[in-house]
Design a protein with these regions (language model features):
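PLP-dependent aspartate aminotransferase-fold enzymes
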Residues: 107-198, 205
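Active-site and channel-lining beta-strand-loop segments
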Residues: 46-67
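Conserved PLP-enzyme active-site core in the AAT-like
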Residues: 164-265
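Conserved A3 ("GATE") glycine/threonine-rich loop of ANL adenylate-forming enzymes
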Residues: 33-35, 128-129, 153-158, 240, ...
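Active-site-adjacent loop/helix segments that line or gate small-molecule/cofactor pockets in enzymes
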Residues: 3-51
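Short beta-strands and strand-loop turn motifs
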Residues: 7, 66-69, 198-204
Length: 265
């Protein structure tokens, strides 16, 4: 019965969205899976969007939808927001890529440091890259190899821990602990006291079900990590929007390195 209903739903979807299907079939000739973002993969095929305005999106078949997703928190201001468009046009009218230092880089860096209470900031191309460089920095700085992450965690396209460590993850030496289980996490840290380079944690699991971490859990895990000389990394790519200075600040927990992303980019 379930398979029958699912097949009917797929058929109804296909009947309603023929132009998206045509786009999908054409895109698959050049793009693996027909697109470049794995999270968008679903049966029978993803919708293709032609435009967006405010809180709505319009697909290539002319259907308009209210956007409750906001590009996975990256689109907090909505689509085609006038102030953003004006600044983009102004920036593009001055240059596109100078291949050198631009004064706006330091201005944005100062604003980031002031807002989030950080010492310095390094800009990257994505949240995935920010976490990659944070982990690499910890490995180089400590001379150790292991990195503690948590079940259900997601730190980018090559750092996925919904069911253990995904086979396509970047080749770090990961050890896992249950999220929000302080005793279990402290035991893992103790067991790897001489080999642990870093602890990487989201203050709230994003892809793992929007489960908030407790202040007690986060602070005790970071304290234990510091006691053995490991680097404390907070992944705030999806959570920094929860407070003016990020979610960790709301919880009263300080990281050594913090990764930001989504709407900030």
């Amino acid at each position: 019965m379930l398979n029958t209903q699912l097949a009917k739903a797929h058929g109804d979807f296909a009947d309603r969205n023929p132009q998206s299907r045509r786009h999908y079939d054409e895109a698959r000739k050049f793009l693996p899976g027909g697109q470049t973002r794995s999270v968008l993969t679903h049966a029978p095929y993803p919708l293709a969007f032609a435009s967006g305005q405010g809180a709505t999106l319009t697909d290539v078949d002319g259907h308009t939808y209210i956007d409750f997703l906001g590009d996975y928190t990256a689109g907090l201001l909505g689509h085609s927001e006038r102030r953003v468009l004006d600044r983009v046009v102004l920036a593009l009218s001055r240059n596109t890529s100078v291949g050198g230092v631009h004064p706006a880089e330091a201005t944005l860096g100062r604003l980031m440091c002031e807002r989030f209470g950080i010492d310095r900031v390094r800009f990257t191309n994505s949240g995935t890259e920010a976490n990659l460089l944070a982990m690499t920095t910890a490995v180089v700085a400590t001379g150790r190899k292991k990195i503690l992450v948590f079940e259900g965690g997601y730190h980018g396209s090559v750092f996925y821990f919904a069911n253990g460590s995904a086979k396509w993850n970047a080749p770090f030496d990961f050890v896992l602990a249950p999220y929000n289980d302080t005793a279990a996490a402290l035991q893992v840290i103790s067991d790897n006291a001489t080999t642990l380079a870093a602890v990487v944690v989201e203050p709230m699991l994003g892809s793992g079900g929007c489960i908030p971490g407790s202040s007690d859990f986060l602070s005790k895990v970071f304290d234990a990590a510091r006691n053995i000389g490991a680097v404390c990394i907070a992944d705030e790519v999806m959570t920094s929007r929860h407070g003016r200075s990020g979610m960790m600040q709301l919880l009263g927990v300080e990281a050594d390195i913090t990764a930001f992303g989504k709407y900030i980019g």
